[in-house]
Amino acid sequence: MFYTHVLMSKRGPLAKIWLAAHWEKKLTKAHVFECNLEITIEKILSSKVKIALRTSGHLLLGVVRIYNRKAKYLLADCNEALLKMKMTFRPGLVDLPKENFEAAYNAITLPEEFHDFDTQNVNAIDVSEHFTQNQSKPEEITLREDYSNDLLFQAGSFGEETEILRRHSFFDDNILLNSSGPLVEHSSGSIAGEKPLFYDSEDGFGDEGAAGEMIDNLLQDDQNILLEDSHLNREISLPPEPPDTIVVEPDNPEYIRLPENGKMDETLSNEEEGFTLDPIDVSDIAEKRKAKKRKLLIDPIKEISSKIMHKQLTSFMDTLMVLELAPPTQRLMMWKKKGGVDTLLSTAAQDLTHAELKMLFTKCFLSSGFKFGRKLMQKESVREEVGSKNIVETSVMEELNFQQDLNQSKTWKDVIDGSKCSSHEDINKNINSEQDIVEMVSSGTEESSSMNAILAQEIENCTVELESSGNEQNIETERWNRRILQTLNSLRESNKMGMQYFSLMKLCRNSDRKQAAAKFYSFLVLKKQQAIELSQSDPYADIIATVGPMFYKM
């Protein structure tokens, strides 16, 4: 049977149809009502995926079953609605008896009842009593007025008896020195008799009973009386607790304060008791915990700051380098090569062309009497140069031995003749080169004052420099020419003996890497000069040389 995901997936458009065709018990009422048969039939007829004939038959079976279910549900709903309509609308049948066809009047009518509320007599309200509820007694809202015999110091004062002596402005000089003033007429005895005016009952300041004497002393301009021993030796008692009863001082019988009414004292005592507050329990107040000092912890910077990032973006040190140009002339190039400390301390002042003379010169530095600061470095450089020269000489000797094995004694004569000729040519060239070097050194000492003058003269004397430059290059080229000629002569001798092919591997047998490289280079130079022809079968295979057109003409 042909199945597709359109039929088997739970959310597919034909999933319910497929379920109805194969598993009708799984269909619910919601599935039946949600299914739109018109759309599903169109999808079956014009589906995007080709459906097999048997599969389409199963789908049509599912459509028929869903349609049957819908028809059953519709029929059941219609029957239920018809039954309810028949039960509700019954012509001529009423559930109530005939007597109760109409409702009673009292059952459908609310009673009208007017309640009689008790009204109060307005005239019976005592307005005066209502307003006197918030009135207080005159004694409670009126200050007590105490009048004494002397009205001099009480005039204009309002309960400030204790502050009189503390104010300097009250005893101005114009009042004390005025002859017409009332203070002049008073005597010391009269002032002493007025102690109750200044005396505050045991205020604890130590001046009890001495207020009048203080004023008398001030009027008499005697300042030392206050420091008498009689006043200092008096015992002053601390103020006792205020008793409930009125205290009458025995020393001051004149100053007695009596309340006008007993009720006023009672109200005052009640007010004092009412306004005194109980002490607060300290244990109830929670002590504030002392906050611990927090240490200032600063995180290390783990990100690249904007300044560093901008600096990295704008720096071109990695991509840009200083332009190092070669010297413009060959003489300056030679000075740069030979101007180092190693070459100056290991070679002579003049350029010695012969290898034996250089060897003799370097042997002088190997003596025990040579003591400088950089002795070890110089010895190492000298040893390296000596070793390199010895390697060159040993390679030449090994080549000569190899040629001796292959060739006859005639090749030795050719080599000796060639070396003699080259030595004569070297001597002639060295004479000219020594003269050029002397001129170069003398001109270099004169031109060391300024670089611009050197460059100008170097451009003018370009032809002279070409003649005197490159003695070392000439030596190297002569060495390579000698080796190439030796290789060519050995190949000629082998060809005369009947060999038509020359193998590079056989020639390089029992040779080190440097000798093999020299022989390979000689083969390449001979190939360039068309003296031999080279061939190789495979990469990294043996190189075979054959006779070329210029083999005997060079």
From Swiss-Prot:
Pfam family, one: Rad21_Rec8_N
Keyword Nucleus: yes
GO MF term set: chromatin binding
Transmembrane segments: none
Source superkingdom: Eukaryota
Keyword line: Chromosome, Chromosome partition, Meiosis, Nucleus
GO annotations of cellular component type: chromosome; meiotic cohesin complex; nucleus
Gene Ontology biological process: chromosome segregation; meiotic cell cycle; replication-born double-strand break repair via sister chromatid exchange; sister chromatid cohesion
Localization per Swiss-Prot or TrEMBL: Nucleus; Chromosome
Listed InterPro entries: NXP1_M-like (IPR049589), Rad21/Rec8-like (IPR039781), Rad21/Rec8_C_eu (IPR006909), Rad21_Rec8_N (IPR006910), ScpA-like_C (IPR023093), WH_DNA-bd_sf (IPR036390)
Keyword Iron attached: no
Assembly and binders: Component of some meiotic cohesin complex composed of the SMC1 (SMC1A or SMC1B) and SMC3 heterodimer attached via their hinge domain, RAD21L which link them, and STAG3.
Role this protein plays: Meiosis-specific component of some cohesin complex required during the initial steps of prophase I in male meiosis. Probably required during early meiosis in males for separation of sister chromatids and homologous chromosomes. Replaces RAD21 in premeiotic S phase (during early stages of prophase I), while RAD21 reappears in later stages of prophase I. Involved in synaptonemal complex assembly, synapsis initiation and crossover recombination between homologous chromosomes during prophase I.
Family under the similarity heading: Belongs to the rad21 family.
PANTHER family, per database record: DOUBLE-STRAND-BREAK REPAIR PROTEIN RAD21-LIKE PROTEIN 1, SCC1 / RAD21 FAMILY MEMBER
Protein name (database record): Double-strand-break repair protein rad21-like protein 1
